């Protein structure tokens, strides 16, 4: 046996949820460009879970189901309030909150398709509120109740900031949610499928996925981009800062991709929203810095920006704390994780790969008295 490190290029399963072929991302056969410009996030949720777009009645029913389950349980609010959250990683808080949701759900270990779908609704509905509640509680603020007349994008911004978002803010966040909803068999999605393939429950699968996303090699790149932009500070500092990093052969966050060789198709949508939002907020320097960095890196390294690069300035312009960027990734990717979990349950086989052993061979046991 010969191992493929990182499983790069290994086809591990079949899936009908999303695909990446020739640098084109599709959800259930629909091009990401088409969906981003025309769909709501709720339509994407339905598409990923049912493998088809909803009609008006089906979409309205899904929205009502999500609205009904959107409130954060008081037990989790009290849990957040019982800790000093100053040094708590938001992803650790979210991971723990998902486990608590499982404890509070009487159907947690009921494994039939109908119960699993109901749990998927609860998880998708509650996760935005969990992130918003954590953010407010650690600032000494009370959580804001979600509005039944708002969709997920509107409600998240409303419950996070405590004020009605503008139409352009809702548009930007809706697009960001769609663009991050699924991405074939990435690390966290694969983790979720491995977990539930043992016939563990859906909450365990999502908790495992969040644990994988917490790692900086998967989630967190856009937070790194915003840290870089903050360090640069002004547009005129961008070129010397980036060239100094390139001379030292240091990594520039937000460029290149493991799968896309000629450019991430999601990046251009966030680039446009970054331009519009930063102009709206009067902080166009974030966009202008990003443009300057992109010009240098693509020229010098031949690396195009990925989805993380412009999402940083988009989220910053929406008033989102930088350490919440990865939890927001989870808010969106929840739809994809749940789609893959439901798909795994529907046609399950335990995932059990092999390892190429590289350790010593044919050793003889030595009594402890005789060991050096």
UniProtKB/Swiss-Prot annotation:
Which Pfam families does the UniProt record give?
Answer: Citrate_synt
**Record's note on what induces expression:** By decoyinine and nutrient depletion.
Residue(s) carrying Phosphoserine? 284
The record lists the catalysed reaction(s) as: oxaloacetate + acetyl-CoA + H2O = citrate + CoA + H(+)
According to UniProt, this protein's pathway is:
Carbohydrate metabolism; tricarboxylic acid cycle; isocitrate from oxaloacetate: step 1/2
In terms of superkingdom, the source organism counts as Bacteria
Per the record, the GO terms for biological process are: carbohydrate metabolic process; tricarboxylic acid cycle
Q: Which GO terms describe its cellular component?
A: cytoplasm
Any GO MF annotation of the entry = citrate (Si)-synthase activity
* Active-site annotation: 257, 308
EC number of the protein:
2.3.3.16
Q: What class of enzyme is it?
A: transferase
Q: Which UniProt keywords apply?
A: Allosteric enzyme, Phosphoprotein, Transferase, Tricarboxylic acid cycle
Function of the protein = Might regulate the synthesis and function of enzymes involved in later enzymatic steps of Krebs cycle. Loss in activity results in sporulation defect.
Other notes: Citrate synthase is found in nearly all cells capable of oxidative metabolism.
Task: State the family it belongs to.
Answer: Belongs to the citrate synthase family.
Name of the protein in question: Citrate synthase 2
What lineage does UniProt assign to this protein's organism?
Answer: Bacteria, Bacillati, Bacillota, Bacilli, Bacillales
Which gene produces this protein?
A: citZ
